[in-house]
Amino acid sequence: MSGGRFDFDDGGAYCGGWEGGKAHGHGLCTGPKGQGEYSGSWNFGFEVAGVYTWPSGNTFEGYWSQGKRHGLGIETKGRWLYKGEWTHGFKGRYGTRQSTSSGAKYEGTWNNGLQDGYGTETYADGGTYQGQFTNGMRHGYGVRQSVPYGMAVVVRSPLRTSLSSLRSEHSNGTVAPDSPASPAADGPALPSPAIPRGGFALSLLANAEAARAPKGGGLFPRGALLGKLRRAESRTSVGSQRSRVSFLKSDLSSGASDAASTASLGEGAEGADDAAPFEADIDATTTETYMGEWKNDKRSGFGVSERSSGLRYEGEWLDNLRHGYGCTTLPDGHREEGKYRHNVLVKGTKRRVLPLKSNKVRQKVEHSVEGAQRAAAIARQKAEIAVSRTSHARAKAEAAEQAALAANQESNIARSLARELAPDFYQPGPEYQKRRLLQEILEHSESLLEPPDRGAAGLPQPPRESPQLHERETPRPEGGPPSPAGTPPQPKRPRPGASKDGLLGPGAWNGEPSGGSGGEGSRPATPAAAGAGRRSPARPASEHMAIEALQAPPAPSREPEVALYRGYHSYAVRTAPPAPPPFEDDPQPEAADPDSAPASPATAPGQAPALGNPEPAPESPAKLEPKPIVPKAKARKTEARGLSKTGAKKKPRKEAAQAAEAEVEVEEVPNTVLICMVILLNIGLAILFVHLLT
């Protein structure tokens, strides 16, 4: 047998034994352009046993056949290590795959390089799945057993679908803690403030609406005489448990394989005794087990999920959520049964005066419970088969370790022979492994330094800034004139300067129904002085009074009586837009007054002495006045006195009567609402009595 160095046209080279024009014996070969290296034994051009090293530093140590990995061997790829059998270049039939960083692993059968058949998946926190696999996913029947809640791993990676399988190349991926959702393996991603825990898909989540509603709700308060009639409902009916806050709800789960978070967002309706416990209150020793069907790596079909605390669900599942008919048994012994939709009980939870007949629902629930129990029994059988397959895979893994030792021996012989035949021949394999080792050290050091930097730099600041920005952008009412309830009758004098160029001041349309003002917070059509000084709404009332006291009273005019007359009826503010009053369009033959203008209605001539503060010429109707005025009762007395002294004409009297009727209509609105409420109450009573009789 001859030997030497042979260079190929593609840039590769071979140095070792040669016979019949083919590599034979021991030798070392590099790939095209010197990329990759195989060192070991050869048989007429084909590898037999040795070590193949990729430029990335990944290695395979084991046996070959017809140029493909076949037999027993160990593959090191990134942070994953496979030990076991190989068939024509693919993993299988039996083998184990383990993460060198987290300890997660799979032990069982393989097909075409994927988990297929029966096996055991052990997760980073120690939780396990034993059962069937198809095309690398949990599919069929199986048992998922979690570790105690205090030891359960916190899963933050939305990229992985399993903690230890081939379904993820991002085995050590992490996402920022402020991400909207951190999916795990036992449910879809849902927004939640909680952190997912490996293997926990059930959560004792209080229903927010039920928590806010009183337990004796309905049409009557809890202390009412007839309110106690609601206690006639049965504890075993589908609709009887709707006042309890015991609904199980998957709060935060993922499309990955092992983590669903549990968090309690509500409290019980009747205090601590009826309140559902928060997830923080779960005992650290609590564990959770699921036995049933799996489809496409998710809990789907019939199954039973149970916690060591007594929480139990039997029924149908879909995509890691309770979906279909099932029964939930709470830790306190109460049961919740009915139809679930995406983890929410949709039948029997709504508050209704007439609960639906639930015979058909109970039959479907019983059927689903029986199916779940059968599925759990089958899952236990499949788990036993998986245990036997796991033990066989472990034996193959031990044999693969022996095969790897033999392959390394062949590799060392080939390297020694290559150095003898060609001392200057470059062997890239050791350099690849050194580079990979250095890269792993750097990644490990970065992973130790990254979390504190992220937490200290960017995470705490956004939550503190966002609320303040929103508060600044939120419009707030400015400080306006004092409340009409606390304003004495005298300050209504400065009305001429109250308007502000047609702009509404604070509280101009609110009306502020205080006891002393009768809701006269603003009057849209009150005339104001054209040359009066305008003031800011934020100026104190005392300052307004000081300025107004210095104003010289102009010539007597009838506009003050018009303003007072409008202020007497507050309905114009609430029912009519800011425009001239409606009674100016109704001319009367008696109202032939040369001083009246289209913007101001007819006035009573003798009211200036009663007011004691005549106002200047009128303003346009668009100018509005936010200043509160004298209470309604006093305005009415003043108006009556003025009319009696001066002998007002028929038009103001007729308009006053119409305005009074409109005011009465406005005041009768609450009576109409009260009548409607009484009618609804009677209807509810009738329905309740019919329900009790039936």
UniProtKB/Swiss-Prot annotation:
SMART domains: MORN
Motif position, Nuclear localization signal: 492-496
UniProt site (Cleavage): 155-156, 204-205, 574-575
TM regions (residue ranges): 673-693
Highest taxon in the source lineage: Eukaryota
Modified residues (Phosphoserine): 162, 165, 445, 447, 466, 483, 536, 542, 596, 600
Chain intervals with Low complexity compositional bias: 176-189, 250-267, 522-540, 589-610
Biased composition (Pro residues): 478-491
Short sequence motif Bipartite nuclear localization signal: positions: 350-364
Annotated MORN repeat ranges: 14-36, 38-59, 60-79, 82-104, 106-128, 129-151, 290-312, 313-335
InterPro entries: Junctophilin, MORN
Single Gene Ontology MF annotation: phosphatidylserine binding
Regions of compositional bias (Basic and acidic residues) in chain numbering: 467-476
Summary of subunit composition and partner proteins: Interacts with TRPC3. Interacts with BAG5 and HSPA8; the interaction with HSPA8 is increased in the presence of BAG5. Junctophilin-2 N-terminal fragment: Interacts with MEF2C.
PANTHER family per record: GH28348P, JUNCTOPHILIN-2
Stated name of the protein: Junctophilin-2
